C-alpha cells in the first residue's frame, strides 16, 4: 500500500523497553531477552496474556532487520500504516514455540504448546434423485487429495531435519520496500520466495525421493456416501478429517451437499409430496378412479367416494404416503393430489337439456324480457390472460421507446422552459 512517512517521528523506543534491551542490542541479545521474559509471562505459567502478546509483537519487529530499520527510523506508526497492526500479525504462541522445537513448550505435557492451524474443508455437490432420498441409497465416489508422504512422514527430507529459512527468519513472510520520493514509500508483505511461505528449507541432497521435498503426495480415495431416507435438499454429509493433509495442520473435512434433482411427476415440499392429476367433468361429477405409481414402484388405487363431487383446483390428501421423515423413516408425510377438471369445449342443445334435467336449478331468478330489452348485448371470446398481459406490457414498452426517440432530452427542455 502507499503511505506518506509521518511528519514527526513517532515512538521508536517502546519495543526495546518491552524487551528490556537498549536500542543497540544485537540479535542474540534480543533472543535471550525475549525467551526469558516470554517464559516468565507465558499464560500457562500464570503470566499476563497481554504482556505475553506485547513481548511477541516487539520481538517479531526487532528480530526482522527490515522491520527494525523502519521502526528505528519512523516508529510504530509507520509499521501500522504499511503492515497492519505494527507487525503483530503472527500468533504469539507460534513465535514462542519456535524457540522449543516442534513441541513448542518447555512446561511439560500439560502446556498449551504450538497450536496447529486447521486445513480447509473441501465441498462437493452430490446430485440425487427424488427416488434416492425416498428409498435411501449408497454412492461410491472416487476423489483425489493430498496426503502426507508415507516415506518421510511429512518431513520432506530423508533425515527428517529442516532448517529455518534465512530469507524470512522462519516467519514465512517477507516485506519489500520501495521509496518514491521524500517521505513516500511502498511496503508490501508477501510469502517468502525462498521457502514458499513455509518458514523452513530442506537441503537438496536430503530431499525425500518420494515427495521431492513437498511433504505431501497425491492419492486416490474412495468414499461411500450414505444418503439416508428423507434427507433434504442442501443437507450436508460430512467426512471428518478426510480433506487434504498438510504438515502441522489439522486436516479439514470433505463435505457433500445434497442437490435433489427435479422429478417429472412428484414435487417435494419438506416431508410432503404433491402430484398433479386431470379428470374429466364427467369424472368430477360422477366419480373417478385411477392408478398412481409411487416412487418405490408401488401401485396406489386412487378413487373418489360415492356421490362425491370434485371441484376444479381442489386438493385431496393421502396420509403416510409422503416423504419419509429424516432419521424417523417409518414416519411419513402426506401425499397431496391437485385436481384439474377438464371441461368440454361445447355442448349440443340435447346435451344441455339433459344436463339441466339432472342438475340443480339456478338459484337466481330468470331475467325478464323487459330487462333484456334495456341491456346492450355483448360477445364473449376466449382469451389466455397471461399472454394478453404480456402483449399489453410489450406494447407499452415499445410506445415509451418511440416517445423517447421522437423527443430526446424532453425532461431537460421542460426544465429550461420553467426557468
From Swiss-Prot:
Alphabetical list of PANTHER family matching this protein: DNAJ-LIKE-2, ISOFORM A-RELATED
Residue span of region Disordered: 378-419
Tissue: Expressed in both etiolated and light-grown tissues.
Domain J: 14-75
Residues noted as binding Zn(2+) 2 in the record, renumbered to the chain: 165, 168, 192, 195
Keyword line: Chaperone, Lipoprotein, Membrane, Metal-binding, Methylation, Prenylation, Repeat, Zinc, Zinc-finger
Gene Ontology, cellular component aspect: membrane; plasmodesma; plastid
Protein role: Plays a continuous role in plant development probably in the structural organization of compartments.
GO molecular-function terms, A-Z: ATP binding; Hsp70 protein binding; mRNA binding; unfolded protein binding; zinc ion binding
Binding site for Zn(2+) 1: 149, 152, 208, 211
Subcellular location, record wording: Membrane
Description of how the protein assembles with itself and partners: Homodimer.
UniProt CXXCXGXG motif repeat ranges: 149-156, 165-172, 192-199, 208-215
Positions bearing Cysteine methyl ester: 416
Disulfide bonds: none
Topology within the bilayer: Lipid-anchor
CDD domains documented for this protein: DnaJ, DnaJ_C, DnaJ_zf
Ranges in a coiled coil: none
Lipidation positions, renumbered (S-farnesyl cysteine): 416
Entry protein name: Chaperone protein dnaJ 2
Residue ranges covered by zinc fingers (CR-type): 136-220
Chief location: membrane
Originating organism: Arabidopsis thaliana
Cofactor: Zn(2+)
Biological-process GO terms, alphabetical: protein folding; response to heat
Amino acid at each position: 500500500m502507499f503511505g506518506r512517512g509521518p511528519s514527526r517521528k513517532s515512538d521508536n523506543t517502546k519495543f526495546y523497553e518491552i524487551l528490556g534491551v537498549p536500542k543497540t542490542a544485537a540479535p542474540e541479545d534480543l533472543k535471550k531477552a525475549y525467551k526469558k521474559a516470554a517464559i516468565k509471562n507465558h499464560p500457562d505459567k500464570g503470566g499476563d496474556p497481554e504482556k505475553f502478546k506485547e513481548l511477541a509483537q516487539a520481538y517479531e519487529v526487532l528480530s526482522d532487520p527490515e522491520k527494525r530499520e523502519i521502526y528505528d527510523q519512523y516508529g510504530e506508526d509507520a509499521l501500522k500504516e504499511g503492515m497492519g497492526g505494527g507487525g503483530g500479525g503472527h500468533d504469539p504462541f507460534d513465535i514462542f514455540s519456535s524457540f522449543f522445537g516442534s513441541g513448542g513448550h518447555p512446561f511439560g505435557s500439560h502446556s498449551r504448546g504450538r497450536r496447529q492451524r486447521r486445513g480447509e474443508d473441501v465441498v462437493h455437490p452430490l446430485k440425487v434423485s427424488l427416488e434416492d432420498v425416498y428409498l435411501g441409497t449408497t454412492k461410491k465416489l472416487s476423489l483425489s487429495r493430498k496426503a502426507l508422504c508415507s516415506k518421510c512422514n511429512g518431513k520432506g527430507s530423508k533425515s527428517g531435519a529442516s532448517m529455518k529459512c534465512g530469507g524470512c527468519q522462519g516467519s514465512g513472510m517477507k516485506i519489500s520496500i520501495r521509496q518514491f520520493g521524500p517521505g513516500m514509500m511502498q511496503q508490501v508483505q508477501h510469502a517468502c520466495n525462498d521457502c514458499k511461505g513455509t518458514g523452513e528449507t530442506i537441503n537438496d541432497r536430503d530431499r525425500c525421493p518420494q515427495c521431492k521435498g513437498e511433504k505431501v503426495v497425491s492419492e486416490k480415495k474412495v468414499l461411500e456416501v450414505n444418503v439416508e431416507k428423507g434427507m433434504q435438499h442442501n443437507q450436508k454429509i460430512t467426512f471428518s478429517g478426510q480433506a487434504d493433509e498438510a504438515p502441522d495442520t489439522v486436516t479439514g473435512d470433505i463435505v457433500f451437499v445434497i442437490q435433489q434433482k427435479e422429478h417429472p411427476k412428484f414435487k417435494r415440499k419438506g416431508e410432503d409430496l404433491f402430484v398433479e392429476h386431470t379428470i374429466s367433468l364427467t369424472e368430477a361429477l360422477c366419480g373417478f378412479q385411477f392408478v398412481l405409481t409411487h416412487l418405490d414402484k408401488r401401485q396406489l388405487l386412487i378413487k373418489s367416494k360415492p356421490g362425491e363431487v370434485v371441484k376444479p383446483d381442489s386438493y385431496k390428501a393421502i396420509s403416510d404416503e409422503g416423504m419419509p421423515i429424516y432419521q424417523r423413516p417409518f414416519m411419513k408425510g402426506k401425499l397431496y393430489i391437485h385436481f384439474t377438471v377438464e371441461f368440454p369445449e361445447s355442448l349440443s342443445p340435447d346435451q344441455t337439456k339433459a344436463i339441466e334435467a339432472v342438475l340443480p336449478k339456478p338459484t337466481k331468478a330468470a331475467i325478464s324480457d323487459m330487462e333484456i330489452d334495456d341491456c346492450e348485448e355483448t360477445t364473449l371470446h376466449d382469451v389466455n390472460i397471461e399472454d394478453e398481459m404480456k402483449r399489453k406490457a410489450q406494447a407499452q414498452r415499445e410506445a415509451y421507446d418511440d416517445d423517447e426517440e421522437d423527443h430526446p432530452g424532453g425532461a431537460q427542455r421542460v426544465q429550461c422552459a420553467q426557468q
